[in-house]
């Protein structure tokens, strides 16, 4: 099986600029590259921060772009998003019984679980998984049984050694870890938020993240003049078979033929 992972697209209403780039242009180029070279992917996951300012126009623009994208997409929300506004535009996007943007997708061989780590409040950037969301996750993990299971979340539950990001990670990580223990065969966990390529092994579970499509977080803050840097964006090409998981972090801009 092949699927695509994208994160942190940060669209701006009216296709406006952001931090020296144009998010809509980056997304267009990303979709074009995926369609040309990986059109056989079974699905695509966009793991949050769909919009920079949680604007209805940004969500409407994303919806229009995805109508032209032949690969089915699972959309998640992040700290820059607004849950209610997102759901008012993407009315058919699945959610759980408490209206959190959480869902699961099951094939004959595998289970994929998508989490909503958005913490309510204006300009709140750390994440949470409340009791209702953790209860839902526990049920999904129990129902998954022995099937290989893959999780997707926006915020990481651990520090990554970048103070700015460590201050806005998912808190309540002990409760999250306890909930994970109900999964019998968790293979990997994908996340976003940090705007960097990372691989982390946390309490025996492996995690990986992607760069943003628009702007990146420097590993060392003092190495750049501003808050962000212009390292290359990438999307993930994920290949799964019976006994192997491979993730290609695919830089798609300015590829020389």
Placement of each model-derived feature along the sequence:
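N-terminal active-site segment of His-dependent metallophosphoesterases
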Residues: 1-61, 68
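Active-site environment of divalent metal-dependent phosphoester hydrolases
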Residues: 12-15, 52-57, 79-86, 120-124, ...
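His/acidic metal-ligating clusters that form di-metal
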Residues: 30-43, 125-206, 237, 241-246, ...
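A cross-domain feature marking catalytic cores of carbohydrate-active enzymes
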Residues: 48, 77-80, 153-155, 249
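Extended active-site neighborhood of metal-dependent phosphoesterases/phosphodiesterases
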Residues: 56-139, 175-185, 203, 225-240, ...
